[in-house]
């Protein structure tokens, strides 16, 4: 168990997907919003295929609106919050009820606010945190870059949507491989990662 935690290996029965605050009011202000939501929707489809638990939050929905329909989360419970962190008492209780839970796969907005606060709280609780970089964004690409760097410094694993789904499958003989393969057959839309990763010193060991 300790070696799995140290290297950040994902398992479908020990992981949960977090989708953070993909709401209507952010549509016009978040850089690459359509692409981020599209990638997060892929993650949600994959989680459903693999029968993984999913947590979806809405930050002050009275002011920021509902979750956008293109995420494909109709019928799923939405946890309302006002804290930046997704780790509210209700959600923490939910996590504690899941046997053998080790890894949280994290997507959403904004990277420097709710995503980073959530990641740091989860790391502090001893969970492995996998930040899906192509499914997280901010109003500012500078904030996005430094938040990703900060989370990595604190012990989170930066990854991509396709990387996560393939690691969760683990084997082409997995009974759900063909179904998940259809989700990732086309490359994920460009969410601007290459343009912000031009500061290699931020990500040096």
From Swiss-Prot:
Renumbered to this chain, the signal peptide range is none
The source's superkingdom equals Eukaryota
Taking the record's annotation, the residue ranges forming a coiled coil are none
Q: State the InterPro entries in the record.
A: Isochorismatase-like_dom, Isochorismatase-like_sf, Isochorismatase_domain
One Pfam family of this protein, by short name? Isochorismatase
* Family per record: Belongs to the isochorismatase family.
- PANTHER family membership: HYDROLASE, ISOCHORISMATASE DOMAIN-CONTAINING PROTEIN 2
Protein name per the record: Isochorismatase domain-containing protein 2
- State the organism of origin: Xenopus tropicalis (Western clawed frog)
